[in-house]
Amino acid sequence: MTEPSAARDAYTHEERAQAGRADGHAHDQPARREPAPRGPWGALVEAVRCPVCGDSLAVAERSLRCPNRHTFDIARQGYVSLLSGAKRTANADSAAMVLARTAFLEAGHYAPLTGALARTTAALGLPAEGAGGTVLDAGAGTGHYLAAVLEALPGAVGLALDASPHALRRAARAHPRAGAASWDVWRPFPVRDGCADIVLNVFAPRNGAEFRRVLGPRGALLVVTPTGRHLRELRGALGLLEVDPDKAERLERTLSGHFAPERTEDLEYPLELSAADVANLAAMGPAARHVEPEELRERAAALGERVQATASFGISVYRPLPPAG
């Protein structure tokens, strides 16, 4: 299938200037009834729960509000701020990392992965015929992969969870049927039990217990991880983090007791990258937190104008185990 592009709108001057500011917060105010806004939240709100008290949420003006009047603003960029204050995570992607990732993905270098993920999703036969269905993307980043999955599931809606407000600005616009909310995926998710038909996890932390809780009994978990061969030609020169050789074993341990593996598809193909592509690749990942941007650019430039590398991924499907007892 044709790969859906990530949201292509660039940050405004104001967004760049205020990249570190988190939009929205939880607060108490009198309840007001307002019609639900157009967009995905009218469909998604049934799945979401108040992160303060666990009660249901409803759309109220430009916010989500529970019966106890805990209120969560829908930022002007379209995402909902469920994390606030000290609960925000320190390792969320920066504005610069998000811009680099967007540029790299829009160049099409991971299009084979995006297409394979969409085909795998379509082959699952979920949701049941006649049902709209819900896809939860845990650690969604810019929503690039969620958009592809939603294209493969006409009528389904998607919820992108991520800790980075900069990424969420993109995720909220990645697809007309996608909503986005700020959240730390290591914490219990602010969604009800069994609400998801598919849980998507692409290059993101894995919370096996929460994946199982929010996934319906006939649902599926899709996990994408890099293999040890991924970008092997660039790791030393750019200072990229090595892929743990025991990553597959650790993945199985993380999901053990919650999921049974169904199948894994290996996807490997050559990459031809420009110096700008290599710079974006280095700047969009964890290395950007440890190496100065100028040094990353110098390392990328030293590799030459055209660079050959290997893209190598595992796409795994898991099914939820029945409850114990």
Model-inferred region functions:
Residues 2-14, 25-91:
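N-terminal auxiliary segments of SAM/dcSAM-dependent transferases
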Residues 45-46, 265-325:
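Conserved Class I S-adenosyl-L-methionine
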Residues 90-116:
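Class I SAM-dependent methyltransferase Rossmann-like catalytic core
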Residues 244-258, 285-296:
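Short alpha-helix
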